[in-house]
Amino acid sequence: MRRIIDIQKQLLPDMTDTLKRRYNILKSIKVSGMVGRRSLASSLGMTERVLRAEVDVLKSQGLLDVSVGGMQVSDAGRQLLDEIEPIMKDLFGLTEMEESIRIAYGLQQVIIVPGDSEQSPHSKHELGRAGAHVLRKCVKKHDVVGVTGGSTLAEVANQLTFSSPDPSCMFVPARGGLGENVELQANTIASTMAKRTGGQYRLLHVPDHLGEEAYQSLMLDPNIQEIVEVIRRARIVIHGIGNALTMARRRKVDSSTIERLQQEGAHAEAFGYYFDRAGNVVHKMPT
């Protein structure tokens, strides 16, 4: 398959571009459910004229249903998207990239979703869908699942369902609150996952960033001790990787720390660890 795609790129480069464009249109409409042409053109970064021409082709093939209310993918379109997914991953070069990352970091599996989740809500939605799909396959009976906060984990939570309710599973926050939107808090995401899967959940009502004295004081509370012990039993932990400076500002760190992170080349953050572009830890904050 990889060789066929390479040959096609050489002999029919225009065909490859057209295929990618129409796939992105169909995929975006499927994610949106029902969408207008102007809104879709804006989110895809193309003119309405170009989009109109492509929509006409997709409609004529029976892949789109167009009405006064907007556009939606037909049953035939959904089936086509499911069948073409592996081919498109090869076409975008994602399969090869997944394997390279898997080998480089010694991982069992890597899944890459096309698009820029920072710019496109459709890409963030697909990232959440992929995460929910993997989690469904990994969770076992009586598992404790720890989750952090953030927009990506919120998308995973909103799309997570089990084939049948599993009250034996428990979802818990893997960190405290960051003072962000309540929808993005770890507590909210844990409860959403539990409600959507028929599981249980526990909440942790403490801020993420604490001084040593405050931390030691909180750990004397029996209720806090109990939930922390449950969290430590988590077999699965799901976390996002945030922008270093954005996460530092959410923790309301002082300007000198922000400046130090910039000087150290901090690019990403997870669980209070700040990493440079090469993956080296350049700073640590207690969480």
Q: What is each model feature region?
A:
Residues 2-24, 37-38, 45-50, 56-65, ...:
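Conserved phosphate- and dinucleotide-binding cores of soluble alpha/beta proteins
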Residues 8-11, 25-27, 49, 70, ...:
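Short hydrophobic/aromatic-rich motifs at helix boundaries and adjacent loops
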Residues 23, 27, 125-133, 154, ...:
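Short, contiguous clusters of charged residues that form electrostatic/catalytic patches at enzyme active sites
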Residues 31-36:
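Short capping segments at the starts of secondary-structure elements
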Residues 67-68, 143:
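Flexible, glycine/charged-enriched surface loops at secondary-structure junctions
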Residues 73-76, 84, 88-209:
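N-terminal active-site beta-alpha-beta segment that forms phosphate/nucleotide-binding
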